[in-house]
Amino acid sequence: MQLSSLSHTSITHKDKKKKMGIELQNHQSHHEEASPAEEPMSRWLINTPEPPSMWQELIGYIRTNVLAKKKHKRNKTKNSSSNLVYSCLKSAFPILSWGRQYKLNLFKKDLMAGLTLASLCIPQSIGYANLAGLDPEYGLYTSVVPPLIYSTMGTSRELAIGPVAVVSLLLSSMVRDLQDPVTDPIAYRKIVFTVTFFAGAFQAIFGLFRLGFLVDFLSHAALVGFMAGAAIVIGLQQLKGLFGLTHFTNKTDVVSVLSSVFHSLHHPWQPLNFVIGSSFLIFILLARFIGKRNNKLFWIPAMAPLISVVLATLIVYLSNAESRGVKIVKHIKPGFNQLSVNQLQFKSPHLGQIAKIGLISAIIALTEAIAVGRSFATIKGYRLDGNKEMMAMGFMNIAGSLSSCYVATGSFSRTAVNFSAGCETVVSNIVMAITVMISLEVLTRFLYFTPTAILASIILSALPGLIDVSGALHIWKLDKLDFLVLIAAFFGVLFASVEIGLLLAVGISFARIMLSSIRPSIEALGRLSKTDIFGDINQYPMANKTAGLLTLRISSPLLCFANANFIRDRILNSVQEIEGEENEQEVLKENGLQVVILDMSCVMGVDTSGVFALEELHQELASNDIRLVIASPRWRVLHKLKRAKLDEKIKTENIYMTVGEAVDIYVRARSTSHELC
């Protein structure tokens, strides 16, 4: 872009600009020759040392984050090796820290909470295992080992660990593409265990190397949309159990599921399944309504699923309803978790896809668990350690994969029950796990006659908690682009697949970040009266602009190849507009634009393209007798300018520590020039 064609001012006007420039330089030179006590702040800026190199930063990051150790008060004598080992163990296993202060009155509360939690966990675990395409006992296994591991390593006091609906659906939909659970359930189960191992490994790596920011790529809006879409898909999947359908699709999109239901209803089906399932669904929802109306009756909705299972099983057993077409769970293998080390498929031809499913499962499970844990930690007034949570989740899933468990995480519905039941520590998880372990040994024969319709009704009753309508409305009011991410995740899961919904949500989130980085705003600044504060003149219309000055702020944290040309053109366009106004208003010629001050306080980094753009901007402005002044450059930005010798081209006297300093020097020089005239 050329500005010279727009600067059709008189020779007198250009001479005045040149004279003003000389006066400003003379004023700056005089200021530089002042006594040390009056040394300008810009000198402090120019003489700053070099910032740490990339390698020094990397080493510093590893020292402070990866190899970080808590500072302990040191006595005159060095700590013994045993104390050091104990300190490391306490850091890895928080139970060693609070376990010493654990008292009987706390155990009474945790015992009641754990038993209440188990009453909800047992029927839900069986249902979620069915949703994941596994036999019922594997859901119960997942409610034993992972909670026990988490109770020693986790930092949340309320988080209830076990299988959850969303992760179960995720595994079912993605692993099914590699192996059909109907044709070869053993091969399917082996892949699920291997996915669980990779999920745990990724979670442990995230915690070990402080990579928790990766979980943040799934924004709150994306999570709300994903959960809502998954809840509807899960609900539609339960129509198979609720109606007792035999022919049903393996796909998860809403069109395929509804089409399958429509065609299946044309085949013979037994309405008794629907009667049993819908009756107990109404009972569970009614119990939940009572619990919400009176918090003291929290145990009613918590016990309702287990009561439903017991009653439905007795009804089916006593009435011989199986002979009338009611589908039942049938055989549940009794006994404790069996080792599954030899079932992990590390030599599978699908190992890459298995690892990918493990990564997606790890992120979804972590996001849900940390979100739930933090919300209840905030209520209780303590801080959740995100990195320790990742480590705990990782090791519990690795251990789970070796003991016939699939991916476990924190459940919102069970955590809410645990909280309402008055839990004080993670001992409630231990009580729950022991109770489930006993039920595996004692109750499996009784559960043989449990109707599948009751499991479907239990899962359906838990789904409303996954649909956050008020949260979606809040996002709509707050940020329309965030709502677009929510809608993309919701409809992607609903009409395509779980992975497509995730990809759409993450893709739109990235596109939004890229758009804001590539097309940042350039703000024109003015000074607020009687202050040294400079604000956007659009946000603060009362801000005063200084004649002959154009102060602009780059709002992007990076001046790089993606936005350098755009930023340069925007700045030149702003100058062009002012030059055009000067040509139209002859009165303003003697106060024409002489200096462009570029506030770079928001710019954290600059690359080669950014440096070239600044150099081109300087040359373009200089050809029109306009000086480029840089204010508030960050340490690394200034270092890059020095390395490129751009500070010599712009001249160091045109680099200032603050916008206020640059404006004040210009105003003083201008007043001096007028006095000389």
UniProtKB/Swiss-Prot annotation:
Pfam families: STAS (PF01740), Sulfate_transp (PF00916)
Keyword Transmembrane helix: yes
Gene3D superfamilies linked to this entry: STAS domain
CDD domains named in the record: STAS_SulP_like_sulfate_transporter
Annotated S-S bridges: none
Induction section of the entry: In leaves by sulfate starvation. Up-regulated after treatment with zeatin, an exogenous cytokinin.
Primary localization class, coarse: membrane
Record's subcellular location: Membrane
One example of a Gene Ontology biological process annotation: sulfate transmembrane transport
Lipid bilayer topology: Multi-pass membrane protein
Keyword entries, A-Z: Glycoprotein, Membrane, Sulfate transport, Symport, Transmembrane, Transmembrane helix, Transport
PANTHER family xref list: SULFATE TRANSPORTER
Name of the protein this chain belongs to: Sulfate transporter 2.2
Organism: Arabidopsis thaliana (Mouse-ear cress)
